[in-house]
Amino acid sequence: MGTNKPVVIGIAGGSGSGKTSVTKAIFDHFKGHSILILEQDYYYKDQSHLPMEERLKTNYDHPLAFDNDLLIEHLQQLLAYKQVEKPVYDYTLHTRSDEIIPVEPKDVIILEGILILEDPRLCELMDIKLFVDTDADLRILRRMQRDIKERGRTMDSVIDQYVNVVRPMHNQFIEPSKKFADIIIPEGGQNHVAIDIMVTKIATILEQKVNL
């Protein structure tokens, strides 16, 4: 554990853009080092007080769906090298589960999520801000595959949600947040050159912090 505050790398981009692939590529490169991943997806607001018919109306692509206050609190605690208890979201019940995941502080924190660059409070806590930029057609195919396989959705429901929610929210909130990125990575996890550049940059920042 270092004596300076951890390095925070923010990785944003639309749903299905390849954020997870970029995150994994960076994480794998530094495997064996002190590094963790903190996903914004875990910080959807608790909705246990709402009836199921209300929960089903949740717009998961709107900034107000996230409990960024808790995410910021946890990120600040990790920056102070304190353990946090990450919530777990149940997409079948559309609310938080009773489960929590203990997260130990590390020297490198990868913060991943569709709207992490939309909140200036989160941006202020990041050392590097990335935006993964991928063609819309590819993003919808990836989202369809994920939601059907991992979240028990039907193809019709995924397409309906994309047309009526995901695409308009992407255009209204996610795409505009791209201007806050330090680096834009086209083609997601397939862009090995951009990932190699990022790995080198992160290594340089870590070295500078150690030598402070």
Curated annotation (Swiss-Prot):
It is found in: Cytoplasm. ATP binds at G13, G14, S15, G16, S17, G18, K19, T20. It comes from the Bacteria. InterPro entries: P-loop_NTPase (IPR027417), PRK/URK (IPR006083), Uridine_kinase (IPR026008), Uridine_kinase-like (IPR000764). Pathway: Pyrimidine metabolism; CTP biosynthesis via salvage pathway; CTP from cytidine: step 1/3; Pyrimidine metabolism; UMP biosynthesis via salvage pathway; UMP from uridine: step 1/1. GO terms for cellular component: cytoplasm. It catalyses: uridine + ATP = UMP + ADP + H(+); cytidine + ATP = CMP + ADP + H(+). Keywords: ATP-binding, Cytoplasm, Kinase, Nucleotide-binding, Transferase. One of its GO terms (molecular function) is ATP binding. The keyword Chloroplast does not apply. The keyword Cytoplasm applies. One of its GO terms (biological process) is UMP salvage. Its main location: cytoplasm. Its EC number is 2.7.1.48. Belongs to the uridine kinase family. This is Uridine kinase. It comes from Bacillus cereus (strain AH187).
